[in-house]
């Protein structure tokens, strides 16, 4: 949520920046009108309340003097009725304003490239060499089928499309990956490990920005106002909802492993095979709470920490700076890390690292005290995937496949897989 004071003072400048996102700004235009109406209603109400207080004092004086106060009492009732009417109108206006505030996306940072689609994203850097195969590389689902480690068909029978059973070495590879990722982030980078709930309430989904705008993308629990988490970002960020953090505690860094659940609304026909786009998948999520002046330095650090996973796995990747039209609703700036997928001859997203500035903190009322006894301010929140586990499995199966159908296990994972060197 944007700062309402900033919206009032910098309305035209903010509107210009939001226009680069390609958003419909009809609601945004209504903000100025409604905010002006709100202030007028508050002014009228305050005048009437002041008048009511004066009349109340006059009634008290007349009653003490045993004089007739009926005409003044009647005036007080009329003033009270008018106040109630204005209060009701004010409540309606404030609800409309709140709806608009919750529907306005974050303001892009000045360093975000201006563009409309993913084609306008800007490559920041590349790492690693793409493998040179002496044979036609297979897609990961075919590699997995030969190894008998992933079962999409039976998962489709048990649940439906976009689900999978991991079996044998496939399950062990998945487990090895998220344990390796957590160990790296906790032991080397100093994150605090958290195992979160997989269901959250409406306030939590609103706090991180999934609601109200993207409710159709979420899995809702019938007859309960709970949602399956689309990412551990939601419960972890909301751990500190409605809290004031002492400044010396910052930065706070959390690493969380969880299953994630997404309806993939609007993705019909895309990535219908394999692990790239599933309704349920595992992910290691990194969440940071930082001082505002440190947040962009922390974004670079967060991105490097996610990259380190791919470097240790020796998987080639590139880092992309998302343009204004591909930024996402909540981010002020976002990097996507894309891993090389040989069978598709392209890079695919495996991590997003975002700085939300105070956008989520304002929605979730997360503040910090810069100095002892100082007035609380909103923290800046960041999050990144460190990494999406299923997509990492796909990248390993494709980049490490051999002509005989076996798959070399990355060296860093071997201690997690009983020191096996090859999947066969």
From Swiss-Prot:
Tell me the residue numbers annotated for binding L-serine: 231-233, 285, 385
Subcellular locations according to the entry = Cytoplasm
Q: Which InterPro entries match?
A: aa-tRNA-synt_IIb (IPR002314), aa-tRNA-synth_II (IPR006195), aa-tRNA-synth_II/BPL/LPL (IPR045864), Ser-tRNA-ligase_type_1 (IPR002317), Ser-tRNA-synth_1_N (IPR015866), SerRS_1_N_sf (IPR042103), SerRS_core (IPR033729), tRNA-bd_arm (IPR010978)
Pathway given in the UniProt record: Aminoacyl-tRNA biosynthesis; selenocysteinyl-tRNA(Sec) biosynthesis; L-seryl-tRNA(Sec) from L-serine and tRNA(Sec): step 1/1
User: Looking at the UniProt record for this protein, which Gene Ontology cellular component terms does it annotate, in alphabetical order?
Assistant: cytoplasm
Instruction: Quickly give the catalysed reaction.
Output: tRNA(Ser) + L-serine + ATP = L-seryl-tRNA(Ser) + AMP + diphosphate + H(+); tRNA(Sec) + L-serine + ATP = L-seryl-tRNA(Sec) + AMP + diphosphate + H(+)
List the Gene Ontology MF annotations in alphabetical order: ATP binding; catalytic activity, acting on a protein; serine-tRNA ligase activity; transferase activity
GO biological process entries: selenocysteine biosynthetic process; seryl-tRNA aminoacylation
- In this record, what's one Pfam family? tRNA-synt_2b
The alphabetical list of record keywords is: Aminoacyl-tRNA synthetase, ATP-binding, Cytoplasm, Ligase, Nucleotide-binding, Protein biosynthesis
Could you confirm whether the keyword Hydrolase appears in this record?
A: no
Record keyword Protein transport present: no
Q: What is its EC number?
A: 6.1.1.11
| Positions bound to ATP | 262-264, 349-352
Q: State the function annotated in the UniProt record.
A: Catalyzes the attachment of serine to tRNA(Ser). Is also able to aminoacylate tRNA(Sec) with serine, to form the misacylated tRNA L-seryl-tRNA(Sec), which will be further converted into selenocysteinyl-tRNA(Sec).
Q: What family, per the record? A: Belongs to the class-II aminoacyl-tRNA synthetase family. Type-1 seryl-tRNA synthetase subfamily.
Domain-related comment? Consists of two distinct domains, a catalytic core and a N-terminal extension that is involved in tRNA binding.
Q: How does it assemble?
A: Homodimer. The tRNA molecule binds across the dimer.
Name recorded for this polypeptide: Serine--tRNA ligase
- Organism expressing this protein natively: Bacillus pumilus (strain SAFR-032)
């Amino acid at each position: 949520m944007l700062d309402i004071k900033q919206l009032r003072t910098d309305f035209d400048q903010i509107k210009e920046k939001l226009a680069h996102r390609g958003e419909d700004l009809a609601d945004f235009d209504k903000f100025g009108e409604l905010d002006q109406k709100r202030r007028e209603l508050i002014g009228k109400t305050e005048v009437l309340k002041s008048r009511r207080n004066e009349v109340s004092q006059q009634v008290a004086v007349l009653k003490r003097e045993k004089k007739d106060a009926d005409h003044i009492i009647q005036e007080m009732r009329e003033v009270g009725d008018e106040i109630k009417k204005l209060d009701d109108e004010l409540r309606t206006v404030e609800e409309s304003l709140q709806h608009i505030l919750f529907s306005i996306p974050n303001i892009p940072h000045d360093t975000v490239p201006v563009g409309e689609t993913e084609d306008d994203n800007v490559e920041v850097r590349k790492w690693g060499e793409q493998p040179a195969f002496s044979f036609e590389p297979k897609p990961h689902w075919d590699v997995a089928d030969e190894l008998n480690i992933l079962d999409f068909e039976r998962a489709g029978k048990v649940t439906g499309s976009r689900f999978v059973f991991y079996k044998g070495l496939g399950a062990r590879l998945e487990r090895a990956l998220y344990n390796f990722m957590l160990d790296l982030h906790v032991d080397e980078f100093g994150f605090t490990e958290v195992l979160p709930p997989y269901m959250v309430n409406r306030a939590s989904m609103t706090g991180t920005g999934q609601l109200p705008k993207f409710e159709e993308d979420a899995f809702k629990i019938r007859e309960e106002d709970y949602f399956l988490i689309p990412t551990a970002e939601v419960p972890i960020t909301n751990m500190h909802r409605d809290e004031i953090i002492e400044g010396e505690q910052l930065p706070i860094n959390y690493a969380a492993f969880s299953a994630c659940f997404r309806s993939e609304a609007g993705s019909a026909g895309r990535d219908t095979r394999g692990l790239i786009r599933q309704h349920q998948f595992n992910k290691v999520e990194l969440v940071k709470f930082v001082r505002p002046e440190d947040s962009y330095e922390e974004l670079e650090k967060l991105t490097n920490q996610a990259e380190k996973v791919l470097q240790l796995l020796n998987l080639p990747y590139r880092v992309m700076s998302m343009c204004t039209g591909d930024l996402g609703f909540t981010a002020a700036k976002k990097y996507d890390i894309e891993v090389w997928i040989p069978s598709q001859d392209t890079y695919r997203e495996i991590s997003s690292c975002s700085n939300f500035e105070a956008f989520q903190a304002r929605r979730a009322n997360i503040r910090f005290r810069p100095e002892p006894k100082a007035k609380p301010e909103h923290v800046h929140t960041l999050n990144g995937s460190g990494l999406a586990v299923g997509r990492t499995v796909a990248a390993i199966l494709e980049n490490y496949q051999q002509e005989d159908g076996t798959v070399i296990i990355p060296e860093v994972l071997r201690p997690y897989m009983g020191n096996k060197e090859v999947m066969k």
